[in-house]
Curated annotation (Swiss-Prot):
Keywords annotated in UniProt: Cell adhesion, Cell membrane, Disulfide bond, Glycoprotein, Immunoglobulin domain, Membrane, Repeat, Signal, Transmembrane, Transmembrane helix
Function: This protein is a cell adhesion molecule involved in neuron-neuron adhesion, neurite fasciculation, outgrowth of neurites, etc. Specifically involved in the development of optic fibres in the retina.
Positions of disulphide bridges: 63-118, 162-213, 268-316, 358-408, 452-501, 543-592
Keyword field contains Cell division: no
UniProt name for this protein: Neuronal cell adhesion molecule
């Protein structure tokens, strides 16, 4: 089965030889075939439909065609036969239909205006050209007019009318002053589309007498100017501000009709003070992205490539601080006919069927008419094999006499389309056009394309065989292209051999053998290495290669991607590069490139040059400056300078440096002139005209340079013509309609005389234009406006001064400004290579549509969704740029099993063109990522529970999970491996029948239909018994728990230290450690070692009032630790000199408080047993607010300090394993005294009469909390409540 595949650019020359019978545009252009096969005429070249000619030159109307036999040509003019033999001024080129009208003999071009049509005819039919309308261009003179000065009040608006003469085509308008400088434009002052100059408000600086409107007629390359306009602005104080008023267009609404594919230009210019700002919107829609541009300071809305969807109302609003105004332009987009399906040539064999289809669209809908051989089909000779059905012609059982050329005409009121398509009936046996025994050579592991170009009618079938009489080639390892080419995607060494192509149709068969050789790839087996070399040492890079013995390699060395310096220090050997006596300039990247006729490889290394170790040096002095400078032998262009050397200071003078000063152009600046050996004391100096010279001399020895000598006397040379022209002349457009010519100005001493100016000349290349020139001064740039977009120009810049011109300058080629590309790449195709790589192909855009320097193509691609999760996510577009005129590229890093979209855009120096339609493609499944986690819980005697999470990236449809596990003994030796396959919808598994007290290692991964993904590992241990019962130690009678445990970690905190205690169950002689840190901090845990096997430890040096986290661990016991605990140190005290706990009054007071609370509890208990009511008021009085107790927090005597012993006692009645924080703040669910219990929430514990229930029942597993959330210590009353 044939499979379509794009053909690389290197095979483009083969395309003309490939036969595509039904859709072919032509018979293959093989010279032998063309001598034998008949072919109807085909128009290959013709002049444009609307052809504007230069009236000063001969008129050339092109008409070229091909066919077999060669066609003859005839013309009509204005619908009637044009007999060129009767017009001596008209000739037809030999073997061509092109007409040449000679107007050099005084004949006016206007005499040949009209509508021309060419017919190319041979025995198989006739093809016709478009109707070519010939019109000579016109550039009439400006009408004479008397222009009155414009007197305008400051702040008023002003319009300077241009009204250029009506030309063909219309001229390009621009405003300049009498110095040929463009008038500056801004939001306030700008040129309208009609060429007029608009002032939103005038300012005093607008006063001038040289507002000049210029009209450039491109066809005749002439520029005409209007009489200068004078503007006088007079000031009035104060200046009156005005709201916006539209200067153009007038009124509140207007209409605009534009044709599809054209550029829509809408304009709004407003008057007002302050200057109004223009804003554009489309009512009921959005301005089209990527096609909308704002020009002329947003006064012009430009939409390129308009379509019917751009019809609608466009509103411009002008606004300033005093108000706003608006205008609505109703845009209607009509369309001249455009092709949906243009008719294509048919090559049929006798008896075959075929169709010609001609479908076009437009607005209004175009009408379709058919012609045959240039004659309307209704009056053409009948053909029984032909049936016309609207836009389709159906052919049935054609015969050789059915050959003809058919014309389809689609027309509406805005234009027409005319297409020729021939039907050529041929009966030809197969022919293979590829030369016999052609040799193809490729590198192993790369694609091999073996050609079998063919022709035949009917279309032959192609088969490939290995060898001369081998078996037919089939299978996925081969790709068969419709053009007959055989592709081996990955050629191997055993692919070498003979391949036979067989072409057959009903008229016969033929075959051809070709040879394929697969070569070993070229490799660099020893690459250059990074080097750090000291100055003056030697550096050597190796580049040892291995290559196919039948290929001849060439080795090239580069430095920083450029050729090696032309320096004898660089020695290139067979497989190495040696650099002698390295210097700092040798720093860089050195690349070895190996090329053969079939492949190329490279490798690079960096050379770093460092300073050599310092060596002791003998100190010498620099020479003294030279003396007694004298000028002799003065001539116009030379002079002799002599001097006396100064002292050498023990180091011989090696050379003298001569410098000069130009007192006329750059006084005070010294320039290098020349240098001579140290043995010379005179030198002949070359001079330039028009320079006031002074000279000085500097002596140089090995130590350095002397101070400069005293300057010589001055010498002024005579003026002369410039000797040279400006350098670095360039022409690059900054806008689509201009050409910016730049150059490097001559320096003052290069001017050779006063009055330095530049003659700037330009003309469009390949158009036979006259040179256009301007003379400018004191600038290095000139802007040519009104140029076509991106066309080549010949440019030259010549220097001149008051004495004359410099020599004729050389010409350079520049280009006018680029514009955004107009056309999107077509025929975008995606070939998915594997789950993470795809290849994208596209057809190159026409070079004319690029409208600039083609820089390459950009491919935008993004993931739409994962096919396994069906969930969209944030779209992150990626961009790959392919430089140059490439038509394919690779998309790496794709996610498997995902849906992607891409589009392609062409790029030039201006930016990106429109995007091609989005192309959707999908990547196949890949292997999944590892499961997101593996957790092992619930260890028992013989089982473990495994829980896991699905892979973060399934990369396909999960088919199963693979679990492997094996036991590990104490020496880390692995036991037998067990493998289990688990359904993909499971997320947990209970492994049973395991050995007790055994460590297992687990390996876990997921699978798709493609294969297994990466695995994660985990270890776990079964326990000896589920109750944690201790077992007797062998021979000792002692019992030890199977697993050591640390539990019931408690803390008692003071201001700067805390007592940590815990309970331990496990083997004797454990070594404990305590880890702690600030709660909520990301800092590492601090570690303290506990001496001996004690079960308590005092942490010292803590910060007062700080919350800490703490945990206890044991060394050498598989690194186990207790769970984390929290505590907080007490606030800092002003003084701690008196231990309050030892004071007698404190002890007495505490006893009295305890006794009072005990009495209250007894009374409450008695009243409750009697069932009596407990009024709320009495309860509130008895349960006084802690904040109004006599022992308040701020008296400095209670609540701030607790001994470690009392703190430890406070914790004893707590529920096992829990602890109340040192600030006595208890969570809501752990407190009986919370506001919820007092009725603030839905769980309040009140009786119907409002009395408290269970207020003093004293749930011992919970502690009461303070009524507020203060971090201060509690009052003694609350402390006693927690004790009861």
């Amino acid at each position: 089965m044939m499979k379509e595949k794009s053909i690389s650019a290197s095979k483009a020359s083969l395309v003309f030889f490939l036969c595509q019978m039904i859709s072919a545009l032509d018979v293959p252009l093989d010279s032998k075939l063309l001598e034998e096969l008949s072919q109807p005429p085909t128009i290959t070249q013709q002049s444009p439909k609307d052809y504007i000619v230069d009236p000063r030159e001969n008129i050339v109307i092109q008409c070229e065609a091909k066919g077999k036999p060669p066609p003859s040509f005839s013309w009509t003019r204005n619908g009637t036969h044009f007999d060129i033999d009767k017009d001596a001024q008209v000739t037809m080129k030999p073997n061509s239909g092109t007409l040449v009208v000679n107007i050099m003999n005084g004949v006016k071009a206007e005499a040949y205006e009209g509508v021309y049509q060419c017919t190319a005819r041979n025995e198989r039919g006739a093809a016709i050209s478009n109707n070519i309308v010939i019109r000579p261009s016109r550039s009439p003179l400006w009408t004479k007019e008397k222009l009155e000065p414009n007197h305008v009040r400051e702040g008023d608006s002003l319009v300077l009318n241009c009204r250029p003469p009506v030309g063909l085509p219309p001229p390009i308008i621009f405003w300049m002053d009498n110095a040929f400088q463009r008038l500056p434009q801004s939001e306030r002052v700008s040129q309208g589309l009609n060429g007029d100059l608009y002032f939103s408000n005038v300012q005093p600086e607008d006063t001038r007498v040289d507002y000049i409107c210029y009209a450039r007629f491109n066809h005749t390359q002439t520029i005409q100017q209007k009489q200068p306009i004078s503007v006088k602005v007079f000031s009035t104080k104060p200046v009156t501000e005005r709201p916006p008023v539209l200067l153009t267009p007038m009124g509140s609404t207007s209409n605009k009709v534009e044709l599809r594919g054209n550029v829509l230009l809408l304009e709004c210019i407003a008057a007002g003070l302050p200057t109004p700002v223009i804003r554009w919107i489309k009512e009921g829609g959005e301005l089209p992205a990527n096609r909308t541009f704002f020009e002329n300071f947003k006064k012009t809305l430009k939409i390129i490539d308009v379509s019917e969807a751009d019809s609608g109302n466009y509103k411009c609003t002008a606004r300033n601080t005093l108000g706003s105004t608006h205008h609505v332009i109703s845009v209607t987009v009509k369309a001249a006919p455009y092709w949906i399906t243009a008719p294509r040539n048919l090559v049929l064999s006798p008896g075959e069927d075929g169709t010609l289809i001609c479908r076009a669209n437009g607005n209004p809908k175009p009408s379709i008419s058919w012609l045959t051989n240039g004659v309307p089909i209704a009056i053409a000779p009948e053909d029984p094999s032909r049936k016309v059905d609207g836009d389709t012609i159906i052919f049935s059982a054609v015969q050789e006499r059915s050959s003809a050329v058919y014309q389809c005409n689609a027309s509406n009121e805005y234009g027409y389309l005319l297409a020729n398509a021939f039907v050529n009936v041929l009966a030809e046996p197969p022919r293979i056009l590829t030369p016999a025994n052609k040799l193809y050579q490729v590198i192993a592991d790369s694609p091999a394309l073996i050609d079998c170009a063919y022709f035949g009618s009917p279309k032959p079938e192609i088969e490939w065989f290995r060898g001369v009489k081998g078996s037919i080639l089939r299978g996925n390892e081969y790709v068969f292209h419709d053009n007959g080419t055989l592709e081996i995607p990955v050629a191997q060494k055993d692919s070498t051999g003979t391949y036979t192509c067989v072409a057959r149709n009903k008229l016969g068969k033929t075959q051809n053998e070709v040879q394929l050789e697969v070569k070993d790839p070229t490799m660099i087996i020893k690459q250059p290495q990074y080097k750090v070399i000291q100055r003056s040492a030697q550096a050597s890079f190796e580049c040892v290669i291995k290559h196919d013995p039948t290929l001849i390699p060439t080795v090239i060395w580069l430095k920083d991607n450029n050729e090696l310096p032309d320096d004898e220090r660089f020695l290139v050997g067979k497989d190495n590069l040696t650099i002698m006596n390295v210097t700092d300039k040798d720093d860089g990247t050195y690349t070895c490139i190996v090329n053969t006729t079939l492949d190329s490889v490279s490798a690079s290394a960096v050379l770093t040059v460092v300073a050599a170790p310092p060596t002791p040096a003998i100190i010498y002095a620099r020479p003294n400056p030279p003396l007694d400078l004298e000028l002799t032998g003065q001539l116009e262009r030379s002079i002799e300078l002599s001097w006396v050397p100064g002292e050498e200071n023990n180091s011989p003078i090696t050379n003298f440096v001569i410098e000069y000063e130009d007192g006329l152009h750059e006084p005070g600046v010294w320039h290098y002139q020349t240098e001579v050996p140290g043995s010379h004391t005179t030198v002949q100096l070359k001079l330039s005209p028009y320079v006031n010279y002074s000279f000085r001399v500097i002596a140089v020895n090995e130590i350095g340079r002397s101070q400069p000598s005293e300057p010589s006397e001055q010498y002024l040379t005579k003026s002369a013509n410039p000797d040279e022209n400006p350098s670095n002349v360039q022409g690059i457009g900054s806008e689509p309609d201009n050409l910016v010519i730049t150059w490097e100005s001559l320096k003052g001493f290069q001017s050779n005389g006063p009055g330095l100016q530049y003659k700037v000349s330009w003309r469009q290349k390949d158009v036979d234009d006259e040179w256009t020139s301007v003379v400018v001064a004191n600038v290095s740039k000139y802007i040519v406006s009104g140029t076509p977009t991106f066309v080549p120009y010949e440019i030259k810049v010549q220097a001149l001064n008051d004495l004359g011109y410099a020599p004729e300058p050389s010409e350079v080629i520049g280009h006018s400004g680029e514009d955004l590309p107009m056309v999107a790449p077509g025929n975008v195709q995606v070939h998915v290579i594997n789950s993470t790589l795809a290849k994208v192909h596209w057809d190159p855009v026409p070079l004319k549509s690029v409208r600039g320097h083609l820089q390459g193509y950009k491919v935008y691609y993004w993931k739409v969704q994962s096919l396994s999760r069906r969930s969209k996510r944030h779209v992150e577009k990626k961009i790959l740029t392919f430089r140059g005129n490439k038509t394919f590229g690779m998309l790496p890093g794709l996610e498997p099993y995902s849906s992607y979209k891409l589009n392609v855009r062409v790029v030039n120096g201006k930016g990106e063109g429109p995007a091609s339609p989005d192309k959707v493609f999908k990547t196949p499944e890949g292997v999944p990522s590892p499961p997101s986690f593996l957790k092992i819980t619930n260890p028992t005697l013989d089982s473990l529970t495994l829980e896991w999470g699905s892979p973060t990236h399934p990369n396909g449809v999960l088919t199963s999970y693979i679990l492997k596990f094996q036991p590990i003994n104490n020496t880390h030796e692995l036991g037998p491996l067990v493998e289990i396959r688990i359904p993909a919808n499971e997320s947990s598994l209970i492994l049973k029948n395991l050995n007790y007290s055994t460590r297992y290692k687990f390996y876990f991964n997921a699978q798709t239909s493609v294969g297994s993904g990466s695995q994660i590992t985990e270890e776990a241990v079964t326990i000896m018994d589920e109750a944690g019962i201790l077992r007797p130690a062998v021979g000792a009678g002692k019992v030890q728990p199977l697993y050591p445990r640390i539990r019931n970690v408690t803390t008692a905190a003071a201001e700067t230290y805390a007592n940590i205690s815990w309970e331990y169950e496990g083997p004797d002689h454990a070594n404990f450690y305590v880890e702690y840190g600030v709660a909520g901090s990301k800092e590492d845990w601090k570690k303290e070692i506990v001496n001996g096997s004690r079960s308590f430890f005092v942490l010292k040096g803590l910060t007062p009032g700080t919350a800490y986290k703490v945990r206890v661990g044991a060394e050498g016991l598989s690194g186990f630790r207790s769970s984390e605990d929290l505590f907080e140190t007490g606030p800092a005290m002003a003084s701690r000199q008196v231990d309050i706990a030892t004071q007698g009054w404190f002890i007495g007071l505490m006893c009295a408080v305890a006794l009072l609370i005990l009495i209250l509890l007894i009374v409450c208990f008695i009243r409750r047993n009697k069932g009596g009511k407990y009024p709320v008021k009495e309860k509130e009085d008895a349960h006084a607010d802690p904040e109004i107790q006599p022992m308040k927090e701020d008296d400095g005597t209670f609540g701030e300090y607790r001994s470690l012993e009392s703190d430890a006692e406070d914790h004893k009645p707590l529920k096992k394993g829990s602890r109340t924080p040192s600030d006595r703040t208890v969570k809501k669910e752990d407190s009986d005294d919370s506001l919820v219990d007092y009725g603030e929430g839905v769980n309040g514990q009140f009786n119907e009469d409002g009395s408290f229930i269970g207020q003093y029942s004293g749930k011992k597993e919970k502690e009461p909390a303070e009524g507020n959330e203060s971090s201060e210590a509690p009052s003694p009353v609350n402390a006693m409540n927690s004790f009861v």
